[in-house]
Swiss-Prot record:
Reactions catalysed according to its record: a plastoquinone + NADH + (n+1) H(+)(in) = a plastoquinol + NAD(+) + n H(+)(out); a plastoquinone + NADPH + (n+1) H(+)(in) = a plastoquinol + NADP(+) + n H(+)(out)
Superkingdom to which the source organism belongs: Bacteria
Signal peptide, first to last residue: none
Name the record gives this protein: NAD(P)H-quinone oxidoreductase subunit N
Compartments, record wording: Cellular thylakoid membrane
Record key words, sorted: Membrane, NAD, NADP, Plastoquinone, Quinone, Thylakoid, Translocase, Transport
Membrane topology listed for this record: Peripheral membrane protein
Description of how the protein assembles with itself and partners: NDH-1 can be composed of about 15 different subunits; different subcomplexes with different compositions have been identified which probably have different functions.
Annotated function: NDH-1 shuttles electrons from an unknown electron donor, via FMN and iron-sulfur (Fe-S) centers, to quinones in the respiratory and/or the photosynthetic chain. The immediate electron acceptor for the enzyme in this species is believed to be plastoquinone. Couples the redox reaction to proton translocation, and thus conserves the redox energy in a proton gradient. Cyanobacterial NDH-1 also plays a role in inorganic carbon-concentration.
GO molecular function: oxidoreductase activity, acting on NAD(P)H, quinone or similar compound as acceptor; quinone binding
UniProt source species: Prochlorococcus marinus (strain MIT 9313)
One GO cellular component term: plasma membrane-derived thylakoid membrane
Length: 153
């Protein structure tokens, strides 16, 4: 497997496309090897789950509010009718401090809708340093394709 030795082909495709859809073997291991090779090549990486992502641009780049679960407790009179809102720092803010390219690796990407996947592709086009890899499910062998090819654009 020459791909796992250097990761050069994967890096070249990632830089050319910006947003890749990936199918990985279910036993795992290949994604961590690729992440390790990306880090060694000077990329900054963030591994995250696609579940609960919401609006990708706001979640990744802007300060935003979340509502924690109430766990059965009632907060009568302390907060508004919508409940407590906590401010959360954006996930990718600290990774953009220098000119190194940033790779966002999303697990369980098959739960994302077509519009959310298109929004991730648009983010890669607008922010030149951002690269996105979305795991779209399992396969017998490691393979990837540009997200635009998967979506049919």
């Amino acid at each position: 497997m020459p791909l796992l030795l250097s990761g050069r082909v994967f890096r070249r495709d990632l830089d050319a496309c910006g947003c890749l859809a990936m199918h990985v073997p279910l036993e795992g291991g290949s994604e961590t090897r690729l992440l390790r090779r990306l880090r060694a090549a000077g990329y900054r990486t963030q591994l995250s789950s696609a579940r609960g992502l919401g609006d990708p641009e706001v979640f990744l780049f802007e300060l935003h509010g979340i509502r924690p679960p109430h766990l059965g407790h009632q907060s009568v009179g302390r907060n508004g009718a919508v409940g407590e809102v906590q401010q959360v720092m954006p996930q990718l803010a600290e990774l953009f401090v220098d000119n190194a390219p940033v790779v966002l690796w999303l697990l369980e990407g098959q739960v994302l809708s077509r519009s959310e996947l298109l929004a991730l592709c648009d983010l890669c086009k607008r922010e030149s340093r951002l690269r996105v890899v979305v795991e779209m499910g399992g396969a017998r062998s490691l393979n990837w394709q540009p997200m635009s090819t998967l979506l049919g654009d």
